Amino acid sequence: MHDSLLTIILLGILEGVTEFIPVSSTGHLILAERLLGAHGANSASFDIIIQLGAILAVIVFYWERFLNIAKGLFQHSTSSWHFVRNILCGFIPTVIVGAIAYHAVKALLEKPMVVAIALFVGGIAMLIIDRESSHPENTSVQSIPAHKAVLVGLAQCLAMIPGVSRSGATIMGALCLGIDRKTATEYSFFLAIPVMLAATVKELWEQRHNLHIADFGEISLGFVISFVTALIVIKLFLEIVTRRGFAPFAWYRIIIGLVAFAFLLFN
């Protein structure tokens, strides 16, 4: 696993901060582990499990809303059923495309230089899309038509490329389809739950031989740090998006992408 307590803390914070904002948590972990010299099979297992901490943060943050939706399903609420429909419509395309292409894409593109380029290009795209999106047609997750939910799910598949960002792909896809900023952001949060749970279960099964009881303490620490950090970041992210849009995150991607590209090119 990781030799340094500081490395565990830094990676837990990094996962919690970057999982739900459109800057690519996977890309940041790849770059950070390259910089810290913390990579390998055991490192992959650690990365997978700390993602669960970030997922749990979304469930806790929106617990009351999820509870109301669950009650609405039993009361035959159209709004609740539309919410579930849209989560499934966004989730299923990702599962299908992921099952077909995930390993091939991962083998070809999981490289630090690809991450640097994807961060930069994604930042430029984010600036343009955020600037051009106006007059949204859909202002709640329940109001999103099924065909738009499917298209957002297909956009989410771009996140198989390290550095693209799952949240970035879904949010930008949603903005292009006339979904407002806050709704696009929350829809991305909600889609993360089934998508990341499915990906985590799959990866845990494939990495099961690299998991050891001796690593439980390190994994637990990373999990807790990721959870607490993500819980704080979700609220802050929604406030920033509502007030300032996605430009701050786009510029961050552009700068980090350029810095990473230069670092990798000369090292």
Swiss-Prot record:
GO biological process: cell wall organization; peptidoglycan biosynthetic process; regulation of cell shape; response to antibiotic
Keyword terms of this UniProt record: Antibiotic resistance, Cell inner membrane, Cell membrane, Cell shape, Cell wall biogenesis/degradation, Hydrolase, Membrane, Peptidoglycan synthesis, Transmembrane, Transmembrane helix
EC number(s) stated in the UniProt entry for this protein: 3.6.1.27
Enzyme class per UniProt: hydrolase
Keyword match tRNA-binding: no
Pfam family, one: BacA
Membrane as UniProt keyword: yes
Reaction(s) this enzyme catalyzes, per UniProt: di-trans,octa-cis-undecaprenyl diphosphate + H2O = di-trans,octa-cis-undecaprenyl phosphate + phosphate + H(+)
InterPro entries membership: UppP (IPR003824)
Family membership: Belongs to the UppP family.
Protein name per the record: Undecaprenyl-diphosphatase
Protein source organism: Zymomonas mobilis subsp. mobilis (strain ATCC 31821 / ZM4 / CP4)
